[in-house]
């Protein structure tokens, strides 16, 4: 695990590969760069691959929320862009899972020149967002803000977090989310739990579960100018595939929407044998197309440039 300093905070990341297009992998809520452990080395055979821990997660720092950094998609999107500039030192493909997709989309909208393309795996639909709750009948929409307010009380929120941060609870949640239960291992449970024991982890968790504002994927997708590949585990109980398909149906930048039968919310961990070749082949194809567009008269000119 390597470290990078960002705005005075420690950011952990992993790296594999020394040649080829740059690819930055972004984990989901409560996870870390280790959630890409089945992808990093394989993709590193053809790419320069980086998997980073977002601020507040994994082995990255967990500063007190809003002092001064807030745990929002704008913050994380800027973290990824600065990582591309300072560590990758150039444009990169961004691959995300769950809320990592929103982070990738935010980065691509904020600075289109920094992002070569997006690979979105079971994008978070943010179904508990304030704007989405407004469309519900009042008796269905009122429950979430009440619970969020209660969790803001330390005497309630902290025991709630501690009750979740237990091996049996994490194992049960993963088995609900994963279509392939054999991918739920003791190793997976342990590396997801380990950061929860660090100072600040409770505050990060409670800040995010109370965060029902900010961008929705349907806000960001129409603003993206780079090509997009979407992979979706068909058995995801949290982000239903029909809603995912509808989300991207009218987005011209989405080149492919690929259902993954029998796979749940985390395809990169459940089915790396499916995900890795698709990510590799598509990003290499996009990189070659971009190179040809820059140097339309052949390799000789490209080599002299």
Label for each model-derived stretch:
Residues 2-15, 45, 50-99, 111, ...:
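Active-site loop/oxyanion-hole signature of alpha/beta-hydrolase fold enzymes
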Residues 109, 116-157:
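Flexible "cap/lid" loop of the alpha/beta hydrolase fold
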Residues 253-305:
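Catalytic active-site module of serine/aspartate enzymes centered on a nucleophile-bearing elbow/loop
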Residues 158-183, 192-195, 207-212:
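Helix-loop "lid/cap" segments that line or gate small-molecule binding pockets
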Residues 234-239:
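Acidic catalytic loop of the alpha/beta-hydrolase fold
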Residues 20, 28-31, 98:
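Active-site glycine-rich loops that stabilize anionic/oxyanionic intermediates
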Residues 224, 230-232:
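Short beta-strand/loop motif that positions the catalytic acidic residue
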Residues 28-38, 49:
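Serine-hydrolase catalytic-loop signature spanning alpha/beta hydrolases and amidase-signature enzymes
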């Amino acid at each position: 695990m390597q470290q990078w300093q960002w705005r005075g905070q420690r950011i952990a990341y992993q790296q594999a590969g020394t040649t080829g297009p740059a690819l930055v992998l972004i984990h989901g809520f409560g996870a870390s760069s280790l959630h890409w452990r089945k992808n990093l080395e394989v993709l590193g055979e053809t790419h320069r691959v980086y998997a980073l821990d977002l601020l507040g997660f994994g082995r990255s720092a967990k500063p007190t929320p809003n002092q001064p950094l807030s745990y929002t998609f704008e913050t994380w999107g800027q973290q990824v862009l600065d990582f591309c500039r300072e560590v990758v030192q150039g444009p990169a493909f961004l691959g995300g899972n769950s809320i990592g997709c929103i982070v990738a989309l935010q980065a691509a909208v904020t600075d289109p020149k920094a992002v070569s393309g997006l690979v979105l795996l079971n994008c978070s639909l943010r179904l508990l967002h304030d704007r989405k709750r407004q469309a519900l009948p009042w008796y269905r929409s009122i429950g979430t803000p009440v619970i969020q307010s209660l969790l803001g009380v330390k005497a309630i929120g902290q025991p709630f977090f501690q009750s979740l941060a237990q091996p049996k609870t994490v194992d049960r949640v993963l088995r609900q989310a994963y279509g392939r239960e054999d991918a739920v291992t003791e190793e997976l449970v342990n590396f997801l739990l380990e950061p929860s024991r660090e100072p600040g982890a409770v505050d990060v968790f409670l800040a995010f579960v109370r965060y029902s504002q900010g961008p929705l994927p349907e806000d960001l997708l129409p603003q993206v100018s780079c090509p997009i590949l979407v992979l979706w585990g068909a058995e995801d109980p949290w982000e239903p595939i029909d809603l995912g398909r509808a989300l991207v149906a009218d987005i011209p930048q989405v080149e492919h929407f690929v259902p993954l039968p029998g796979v749940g919310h985390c395809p990169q961990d459940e089915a790396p044998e499916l995900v890795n070749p698709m990510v590799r082949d598509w990003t290499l194809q996009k990189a070659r197309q971009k190179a040809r567009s820059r140097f339309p008269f052949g390799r000789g000119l490209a080599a002299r440039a």
